[in-house]
Amino acid sequence: MMKLAGVVITFFPDIPELQKNINSYIDDLDFLVIWENTPIDKRNYKEDDLKNISQKVIVLGVGSNLGIGAALNQSIQHFLDYDCDYFITFDQDSSFDSGVLNQYKKLVTENSGEEIGVFGTNYISNDSLSYSDDSDSLIVNECITSGSIFPKTNFIKGLFFNEDFFIDAVDFEYCYRIAKTSGLTTVIFPKIILNHNIGYADQSFLSKLSDNYSAFRTFFLIKNQIYIWRKYPDLFEFKRKIHLVVKYITLRIVSVVFFEQDKYAKLKSIIRGINQGLSKP
């Protein structure tokens, strides 16, 4: 039977909601690391609130926000000596319906092969599925980190996440890189549904025009996506290139200038993101 260790990265979590989400999959995990990215001086809860969710939980962190890539890497490093075959990663707002993770594990076992580097799910966000295909499995260019299962052998080979990608596109960059450098494919199972919320965008009227992200988030979103476009132009799909140019840059500038607060910082972050995305080696 597959031995599966989990990692969930938390940042200012709602503890009851986090507990509910973890309880939706903890029975099908052998261990779970909760990596706490919330700065220790800004938490309104105790570490025991996390530990008490389950006896399988191990709480790790350094007291500050390391970003997604580094938090995933340090959590997985912790597990490399454990008796497990695969790792599954979660966002704090992700969950499975009853029995879904057990079914997912069976599919991974049945479809495992040396050529597969990532297994992913069909996630539901805002009442919409990301894939409408009813195939049993699909080979894709990329999948989101949350709900993805990674063979332990990836990390034994040194295929860790890019820590430069503090937030945004950590998942896409990983899938593209292991495909290019190691010939590993990404496979999703359209019938395995993950309940998930994409991003941290403002859900007001303004979001119809452009995602009202902070200056900090805006910088990494633009920088990282321009970088993976340059680095992996054949894998970063045309529709994503259009989305980046139109929504994340052009419409975002319009939105910031006419509707958003903190205009100077956000416009500066857009320019910095473009410059660093184009110049990063």
Q: Where are the regions a protein language model picked out?
A:
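A recurrent flexible, glycine/aromatic-enriched loop bordering the glycosyltransferase active site
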Residues: 132-150, 212
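Conserved donor NDP-sugar-binding/catalytic core segment of glycosyltransferases
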Residues: 98-131
